[in-house]
Amino acid sequence: RTAIWKHIKALRQKGYKIESYTKRGYRLLEEPDLLSPLAMKQILKTDVFGKRYVYMDTTESTNLEARRLAQQGAEEGTVVVTEEQAAGRGRLSRGWYSPFGKGLWFSLILRPDFPPVEAPKCTLMAAVALTKAFHKMGLTDAGIKWPNDILVNGRKLVGILTEMSGSMEEISHIVMGIGVNVKTKQEELPEELKLIATSLAMEDIDIERTEAFRLILEELEHQYYDCLLYTSDAAD
């Protein structure tokens, strides 16, 4: 019984709603909104992004994991996503609050065919894609704060961290880390973030994380390949 209780406790901590009955057992009431490969592959309609989908309950940083995979040759479009980050980080090595099951904490591996000097446009491309995805969710007042934030009424909703590896002449790969606050409530934020952060839930957008992730990945793919096509046309 002790072993069963420990398993039930662990499942509840992951968001499973389980009812207990004295001397009768347990009943599963509701499954959590997890970003599992099975959940996402059933709904995701992309050609490249997320075809390789690396999912973890927890990790230090998705950018660190994605960088390791990229150095091993992971293909473009590989997505690394976690339910929580122990050491999430943003620009200038600032910490990024990444609690379990409350947001989208993910990194994307890109291998664009343009010169390194043009790499910063990937960050702008991502910001545009995210803003368009938010419009589809019903959030119309999200704005881009250059170079890597999306704000709503002055409060941060999204952080983007883009890291490039390559030479002066050629990009080997880009790891794009994105953090989106989805389910976090005002009272759940650390004191130092209460006045400067927001989430989709705090902006009255009620959406499952799986659906939000689907919209974001599909828009990221669309904007990225449009960007590559425009770059190719401009070079011809």
Predicted feature locations:
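N-terminal lobe of the biotin/lipoate ligase/transferase fold
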Residues: 1-136
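Short amphipathic alpha-helical/adjacent loop interface patches that line ligand
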Residues: 8, 186, 220
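Nucleotide and nucleotide-moiety/phosphate-recognizing core
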Residues: 98-197, 201, 207
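Short alpha-helical functional segments enriched in proximate histidine and acidic residues
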Residues: 133, 137, 219-226
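Adenine-nucleotide phosphate-binding core of ATP-dependent small-molecule kinases
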Residues: 210, 228
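Conserved small/polar residues in nucleotide/adenosyl-binding loops
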Residues: 230-236
